[in-house]
Amino acid sequence: MALNDFHVSEPYTLGIELEMQVINPPGYDLSQDSSTLIDAVKPQLTAGEIKHDITESMLEMATGVCRDIDQAAAQLSAMQHVILQAASEHHLGICGGGTHPFQKWQRQEVCDNERYQRTLENFGYLIQQATVFGQHVHVGCANGDDAIYLLHGLSHFVPHFIALSAASPYMQGSDTRFACARLNIFSAFPDNGPMPWVSNWQEFAGLFRRLSYTTMIDSIKDLHWDIRPNPAFGTVEVRVMDTPLTLDHAINMAGLIQATAHWLLTERPFKPQEQDYLLYKFNRFQACRYGLEGVITDAYTGDRRRLADDTLRLLDNVTPSARKLGADSAIDALRLQVKKGGNEAQYMREFIADGGSLIGLVQKHCEIWAGQ
């Protein structure tokens, strides 16, 4: 199967996708009513899109193409408002977080959608287990070769993005001991983790053609790498973040990725090499397991650095780019988060340590998303 030509898009434009949890009070388990909400809110949208994801307990909010984080925030805020209104009318809740802390995957209903039903046929129970919730950020690129360079550059900071956004410590009623347990769910999939090495867009087109020989790949959407190019949109898509508990944090993460993309493509601080990925999964694991307290290792020098310290260095590097893009508020907020030493996974554990229950935790998450 041939790959579409890379659609030229304006560099550094943004698109944000948030996979939200649809909750059924008063037990605060996952609901199976996303179709009801989607039908209710679609006629009210003036920008962006609200659509299905894999199962009926998932609802995806997606912006249109945005020039900056302020425009993205306005679109997401408008969608948030109509979703919350419809959820209230149907006695449902909405919240963020990378996993629901006590749902049972066996109860999840795969959406009545041709693509998802085909995926269920290919992957069986793994698809129901993939009822987890992430944030994806698209960044516009001028051409395919820039997209491949940007993908490799951003891959250096996958642990940083995971650690900052980690919000999935609980799963199936248990503390997983991970800051981000969500990404572990995908470890059984054949396309888990980093994209196979290519050095330019022509090589990527050849890679895609060979992957399509498996008959499991019909489009880019069927490849679930941590970061992937999207030729139809003319973007690079970062897919490793847990869905945050607040819209503000989602915007901050998008601002960081946009600013990092600008820094990478204007400064070209790395010469991508296949050996860059030698310790990729080890460093990714550190971020998932320990969050900002994780330790990453340089594949060339063996130097070991605490993720919190290296994240502060990244934030300093991208600050000039953030100012040019109007994303400096995002960098300032994330810098403060790192200096305070926490992420949302840590907050969740503190809630439970203070005597809260998992049911109470989900209730609190719904209140946070509703701004209560």
Swiss-Prot record:
Lineage top rank: taxon: Bacteria
Broadest EC class assigned to this enzyme: ligase
An example molecular function term from Gene Ontology annotations: ATP binding
InterPro entries: GCL_type2/YbdK_subfam (IPR050141), GCS2 (IPR006336), Gln_synth/guanido_kin_cat_dom (IPR014746), YbdK (IPR011793)
Catalytic activity as recorded in UniProt: L-cysteine + L-glutamate + ATP = gamma-L-glutamyl-L-cysteine + ADP + phosphate + H(+)
SUPFAM superfamilies linked: Glutamine synthetase/guanido kinase
Entry keyword set: ATP-binding, Ligase, Nucleotide-binding
Enzyme Commission number(s): 6.3.2.2
Disulphide bridges, residue numbers: none
GO BP: modified amino acid biosynthetic process
One Pfam family per UniProt: GCS2
HAMAP family named among the record's database cross-references: Glu_cys_ligase_2 (MF_01609)
PANTHER family membership: GLUTAMATE--CYSTEINE LIGASE 2-RELATED
Function text: ATP-dependent carboxylate-amine ligase which exhibits weak glutamate--cysteine ligase activity.
Family recorded in the similarity comment: Belongs to the glutamate--cysteine ligase type 2 family. YbdK subfamily.
UniProt subunit comment: Homodimer.
Protein name listed in UniProt: Putative glutamate--cysteine ligase 2
Organism per entry: Salmonella enteritidis PT4 (strain P125109)
Lineage, uppermost ranks: Bacteria, Pseudomonadati, Pseudomonadota, Gammaproteobacteria, Enterobacterales
